[in-house]
From Swiss-Prot:
One of its GO terms (cellular component) is plasma membrane. It comes from the Bacteria. It is found in: Cell inner membrane. It is a multi-pass membrane protein. It comes from Solibacter usitatus (strain Ellin6076). This is Potassium-transporting ATPase potassium-binding subunit. Keywords: Cell inner membrane, Cell membrane, Ion transport, Membrane, Potassium, Potassium transport, Transmembrane, Transmembrane helix, Transport. The lineage of its organism: Bacteria, Pseudomonadati, Acidobacteriota, Terriglobia, Bryobacterales. The keyword Transit peptide does not apply. One of its GO terms (molecular function) is P-type potassium transmembrane transporter activity. The gene is kdpA. Part of the high-affinity ATP-driven potassium transport (or Kdp) system, which catalyzes the hydrolysis of ATP coupled with the electrogenic transport of potassium into the cytoplasm. This subunit binds the periplasmic potassium ions and delivers the ions to the membrane domain of KdpB through an intramembrane tunnel. The system is composed of three essential subunits: KdpA, KdpB and KdpC. InterPro entries: KdpA. The chain crosses the membrane at residues 6-26, 64-84, 135-155, 179-199, 254-274, 285-305, 382-402, 419-439, 459-481, 488-508, 529-549.
Length: 568
C-alpha cells in the first residue's frame, strides 16, 4: 500500500462522516412532514400528486397495508419494465433500431430493476434503446430506491412509536423520498458529472475512423442523468457495458470520488435520520461506527491483496501489483476502494473487473454482499438490515445475562426474533440453494469461462449478487441463458421481498409495544461495547453461514495460487 492511497481512503471516510449529519437531518425533516428549504417549490407538486393519485396524506397504514402497497407498486413496476423492453423496437428514441428484448432477458431485467439490483445479463449499448433506458430503467432507479427508503422509515417508526397500530403511509413516504431527496440530489449530481465530461445527448451512435484505418462505432446517449441516480440510489446498472470504467460514465478521478460519495451518502445519512426520529442521535452514530469498522476492514484486505498482486506473475519479474482489469487513471487504491464501496452498499457499479481480482480481493466483495448488504448497504436496505442485526445483538446480550432483551425501550420478544431470523435466513437459503442447484446444471457449466474454484466462485457470486440485490458480477459467467435469466430473476425477487415482509411485520409488532423505562440493568446500545457486539454478530451470523462455500471457492484458490496452480 502507498501513503497516497491510504490518505485517499481516509479522506473519503472523513467526507462520508461529515455529510451524514446534514443529509440525515434533512431527511428526518422530510419524513416528519416539516418545512424544508425545498418546501416552497415542491410542496405544491407533492399535493398535486396526492390529488391526482387519490392518496389521503393523513391516512396511515398498518404493516399489512404498508406491505401490500409496496408489493402492488412493485408488481406494476415489474410488468411496466417488462412491457417496454418487449415493444422497444416500435417506440421512438431508438436511433440504432435495436430489436425487442427476448422474453427471458426481459423478465430478468424487469426483476433486476424493480428490486434495485440492476443485474445486467446484456450489453446495454446493443440491447436497450434510449427510451427503454430512460422510462423503464432510469425511472425504476428512482422508484426502487424510494421504496427502500420508505421501508426503512417505516421500520424506524416501529421504534419511535409506542402503543400504535400504524407505520405511516407507503405512498406518502415513497413520494417524499422521490420528490425531496432523490430528484434534487440527482439533478445536482448530473450537472456535476456533465462538467466532468459525462455525456448527455440523444444522438445516434458516432462512427469514426481510427488511426489504423478501421471504422469504430462510439455509443452515445443520456448518460449523466442516469449516472447520477445509478449511484445515489445504489442501483449500479451501467449505461454502458463497462459501467463506471467507461470514460463516458466516469471520466476523471474527481468524478470517481463523487460517485463513491453518492453511493454512501444516503445510507450514511439515514443512520442520523434514525437517531433524530428516535430522539437519540447517539444510537445512529453507533450504527454508523459499526458500518465504518466493517467497511475499513474490507478495504484493508482488498487493497494490500491487489497491491501484492499474483505471486505467479511476480516470479516472472513483473512487479506493480495486480493491474489486470483496472483502469490506469484510477490505479489500485481507487479500484480497491470502489470495489469495497459498491459491494458494501447494494450498488453493484464497478470501475474495474471483479473477476480479475486476486482470490482474497474477490473474497471481500463476495462476503460484503453475503453479510446482507448492511455495511452502509443500499438506500434504506442498509439501515433496516443493520437494525435487524442490532435486534439480534441485544437478544444475544440479553440471553447472556438472563434478562429480557430490550432495544430502544422496546422489549424484544419471540415474535420479533422469529421475524428477524426469517429475514436473515432468506438470504442464505436463496444464495446457497440456487447456487447448489445451478452448479449441477450443464447449462450453467457451459456458461462458466473458468473452471475449478474460480468457476465455482463465479456461480456463487452471481446468485449472491442477485439475492443480495447488488448487481455486480464476476463477468466470466455468461449469464444470458434461459436458465440463469429465470433463476437469477427469482432470486432477486426472493432476496428483496421475502426479507421485507417479515421486517415490516416486526416493525408493526414493535410499534404496538409500550416503552420500557431505562433501568440500571438496561444494556446501553450507543457505546463501544455495543458497536463491538454488533460487528461480531454481523460477522458471525452473516459470514460464517457461507464459510464452507467460500472455502471451496476463493479461499482454496488463494492457497493454490501461492503454489503456482492456476485455472483457466
Amino acid at each position: 500500500m502507498t501513503t497516497n492511497g491510504i490518505l485517499q481512503i481516509l479522506a473519503f471516510t472523513a467526507i462520508i462522516w461529515a455529510l451524514a449529519k446534514p443529509i440525515g437531518g434533512f431527511m428526518a425533516k422530510v419524513f416528519a412532514g416539516e418545512r424544508t428549504w425545498l418546501h416552497r417549490i415542491l410542496r405544491p407538486v407533492e399535493v398535486a400528486i396526492y390529488k391526482l393519485c387519490g392518496v389521503d396524506e393523513a391516512a396511515e397504514q398498518r404493516w399489512t397495508g404498508y406491505a401490500g402497497s409496496l408489493l402492488a407498486f412493485s408488481l406494476v413496476s415489474l410488468l411496466f419494465t417488462y412491457l417496454i423492453q418487449r415493444v422497444q423496437q416500435w417506440l421512438p428514441l431508438n436511433p440504432q433500431g435495436l430489436a425487442n428484448v427476448a422474453a427471458d432477458l426481459g423478465w430478468n431485467t424487469a426483476a433486476s430493476f424493480t428490486t434495485n439490483t440492476n443485474w445486467q445479463a446484456y450489453t446495454p449499448e446493443t440491447t436497450m434503446s434510449y427510451i427503454t433506458q430512460m422510462i423503464a430503467l432510469a425511472t425504476h432507479n428512482f422508484f426502487s430506491a424510494a421504496a427502500g427508503i420508505a421501508v426503512a422509515i417505516a421500520f424506524v417508526r416501529g421504534f419511535s412509536r409506542h402503543s400504535a397500530n400504524t407505520l405511516g403511509n407507503f405512498w406518502v413516504d415513497f413520494t417524499r423520498a422521490t420528490l425531496y431527496i432523490l430528484l434534487p440530489m440527482s439533478l445536482l449530481a448530473a450537472l456535476f458529472f456533465c462538467s466532468q465530461g459525462v455525456i448527455q445527448n440523444l444522438d445516434p451512435y458516432t462512427k469514426v475512423t481510427t488511426l489504423e484505418g478501421a471504422v469504430q462505432t462510439i455509443p452515445q446517449g443520456p448518460v449523466a442523468s442516469q449516472e447520477a441516480i445509478k449511484m445515489l440510489g445504489t442501483n449500479g446498472g451501467g449505461f454502458f457495458n463497462a459501467n463506471s470504467a467507461h470514460p463516458y460514465e466516469n471520466p476523471t478521478p474527481l468524478a470517481n470520488l463523487a460517485q463513491m460519495v453518492l453511493i454512501f451518502l444516503i445510507p450514511a445519512g439515514l443512520t442520523y435520520t434514525f437517531g433524530k426520529m428516535i430522539k437519540d442521535t447517539r444510537q445512529g452514530w453507533a450504527l454508523l461506527a459499526a458500518m465504518t469498522v466493517l467497511f475499513l476492514a474490507g478495504v484493508c484486505v482488498v487493497y494490500p491483496a491487489e497491491q501484492a498482486g499474483n505471486p505467479v506473475i511476480t516470479r516472472l519479474g513483473v512487479a506493480g501489483g495486480n493491474m489486470e482489469g483496472k483502469e490506469v487513471r484510477f490505479g489500485i487504491a481507487n479500484s480497491a476502494l470502489f470495489t469495497v464501496v459498491t459491494t458494501d452498499a447494494s450498488c453493484g457499479a464497478v470501475n474495474n473487473v471483479h473477476d480479475s481480482l486476486t482470490p482474497l480481493g474477490g473474497l471481500v466483495p463476495l462476503v460484503n454482499i453475503e453479510l446482507g448488504e448492511v455495511v452502509f448497504g443500499g438506500v434504506g436496505s442498509g439501515l433496516y438490515g443493520m437494525l435487524l442485526f442490532a435486534i439480534l445483538a441485544v437478544f444475544i446480550a440479553g440471553l447472556m445475562v438472563g434478562r429480557t432483551p430490550e432495544y430502544l425501550g422496546k422489549k424484544i420478544e419471540q415474535k420479533e426474533v422469529k421475524m428477524v431470523m426469517l429475514s436473515v435466513l432468506v438470504l442464505a437459503l436463496c444464495i446457497l440453494g440456487f447456487s447448489a442447484a445451478g452448479i449441477g446444471q450443464q447449462t450453467v457449466a457451459n456458461s462458466m469461462t473458468n473452471h475449478g474454484p474460480h468457476g465455482l466462485t463465479e456461480v456463487l457470486y452471481g446468485y449472491t449478487s442477485a439475492a443480495g440485490n447488488n448487481g455486480s458480477a464476476f463477468a466470466g459467467l455468461s449469464a444470458n441463458t434461459m436458465y440463469l435469466n429465470t433463476t437469477l430473476g427469482i432470486a432477486m425477487l426472493c432476496g428483496r421481498f421475502l426479507m421485507l415482509i417479515p421486517l415490516l411485520a416486526a416493525a408493526g409488532s414493535l410499534a404496538q409495544k409500550k416503552l420500557v423505562p431505562v433501568s440500571a440493568g438496561t444494556f446501553p446500545t450507543h457505546g463501544p461495547l455495543f458497536v463491538t457486539l454488533l460487528v461480531g454478530v454481523v460477522v458471525i451470523v452473516g459470514a460464517l453461514t457461507f464459510f464452507p462455500a467460500l472455502s471451496l471457492g476463493p479461499i482454496v484458490e488463494h492457497f493454490l495460487m501461492h503454489q503456482g496452480r492456476l485455472w483457466s
